Every structure is written in structure tokens, then in C-alpha cells.
């Protein structure tokens, strides 16, 4: 059985530090991802009827190429399923509101400061004036794995967009429950391929990867971001 490197915990997500990184947008265009045998497309927020979500998955040109490369680094039986890419501010706000409801439902006695801190772990604040949300740049992509023979999306140990500790990318490395063994392996495969293709991952979401934006610069050590806010027109 092939073994894959464990998922190492990265430095903590720090929006204040990320916001300080300079942006020199290179003007690279957005493009619509195309379906292929190694990449499955599920425009999740459009399917959930979130107002403003588009029926397409859109990324910067280089990000799309790197995603295609990442798919070739997977075992032959697996492919990448893409849930989201470029995202307008109205959808970002809708998602922040939805995640807030999840957190409040689980922690009804929590105060506002604690809730906001938890929110920042799982969804960027669209109302910040010192930076744009990563998905608005076209440099962020949300992905998982699927089995090419069946089309089945693989178990990753927590659901996409689930706001909880098991969604932390490295969380399963410390879990002893045998039921999570397969999911742990799946995360190792996903993270390994995406990082090898040039992406960085935020530590609070196993599904979220970046290239070219401030998140990527922060986690990769680059001195600047090459993608700022991008705008899409059908």
C-alpha cells in the first residue's frame, strides 16, 4: 500500500499579517474551468441557490493550469472535484452569515468576540477595508477528491464548509479513531498533490488552497501577491 507524507501543521492563519502583504496584480484574466476526466465540477453555491452565485467555476489562468497539473499528480484512480473558485462579495457575505448560524447553533452562549474569531477561521470577512477576500482574487480554490470509476466524492473526515475542529487540515493526524483512517489518507493525498503543484493551504480548511493572492504570499513566504480583486462578467 502506498504511503503518503503526513499533513504538517502550518503557521496559524493571521488575517492582520496577511492584510499587510503588498499586492501587485499582474492583470491575468479569469477563465471558466472545463470538465475533464481528472477534474469534476460542482458549483456548490449556485446549486444551493445562494443569491449572486454563478453557474460556473472560475479561476485565474495560471491557477487553472496548476489545478490541472495537481490532478495529474494523484493516483490514477482519483481526480479532483472543484466546489468553488472566484466568488463575488455578495456570496462571501451570505456564506459568512451561514457559518455564523452554524457556530451560534453549536455555541449558543458564546459572546460576539468569540464568535467573530471562530468565523475568521472558516470564512474571510468581506467587510474588511484593508484586504479583499481570497476567493475574490480568483486565486483561491476549494477542492476534494473523487473516485474516477464511480464519480463518488471521497470521505475527508468532515464535510466541505463544516465549521469545526475536524476541518483543520492536520486535525486527523492526531485522531486515533480507526474510522478516520481512510479520510486521513485522502487528506494526505490531496494536500500532497496541491502543494507539489504550487498551492498553499490554510490550516483551518482542508479543502481551501491558494496561489498568487495574499494568502499564498503569507504561507509561501513570497514578498508580494500577484492577484488582487478580480471581476467576472458572463
Language-model features: where?
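Conserved metal-phosphate-binding beta-hairpin within the catalytic cores
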Residues: 209
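Extracytoplasmic cell-surface/polysaccharide-interacting catalytic and binding patches
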Residues: 1-85, 89-203, 216-234
Amino acid at each position: 500500500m502506498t504511503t503518503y507524507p503526513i499533513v504538517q501543521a502550518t503557521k496559524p492563519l493571521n488575517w492582520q499579517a496577511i492584510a499587510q502583504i503588498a499586492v501587485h496584480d499582474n492583470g491575468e484574466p479569469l477563465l471558466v474551468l472545463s470538465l475533464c476526466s481528472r477534474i469534476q465540477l460542482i458549483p456548490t453555491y449556485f446549486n444551493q441557490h445562494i443569491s449572486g452565485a454563478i453557474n460556473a467555476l472560475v479561476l485565474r489562468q495560471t491557477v487553472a493550469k496548476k489545478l490541472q497539473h495537481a490532478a495529474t499528480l494523484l493516483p490514477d484512480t482519483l481526480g479532483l472535484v472543484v466546489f468553488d473558485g472566484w466568488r463575488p462579495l455578495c456570496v462571501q457575505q451570505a456564506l459568512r452569515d451561514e457559518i455564523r448560524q452554524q457556530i451560534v447553533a453549536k455555541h449558543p452562549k458564546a459572546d460576539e468576540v468569540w464568535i467573530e474569531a471562530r468565523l475568521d477561521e472558516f470564512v474571510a470577512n468581506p467587510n474588511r477595508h484593508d484586504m479583499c477576500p481570497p476567493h475574490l482574487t480568483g486565486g483561491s480554490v476549494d477542492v476534494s477528491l473523487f473516485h474516477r470509476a464511480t464519480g463518488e466524492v471521497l470521505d475527508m473526515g468532515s464535510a466541505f464548509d463544516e465549521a469545526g475542529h475536524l476541518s483543520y487540515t492536520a486535525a486527523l493526524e492526531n485522531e486515533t479513531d480507526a474510522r478516520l483512517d481512510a479520510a486521513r489518507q485522502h487528506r494526505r493525498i490531496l494536500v500532497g498533490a496541491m502543494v507539489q503543484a504550487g498551492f498553499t493551504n490554510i490550516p483551518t480548511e482542508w479543502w481551501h488552497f491558494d496561489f498568487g493572492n495574499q494568502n499564498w504570499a503569507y504561507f509561501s513566504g513570497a514578498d508580494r501577491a500577484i492577484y488582487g480583486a478580480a471581476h467576472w462578467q458572463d
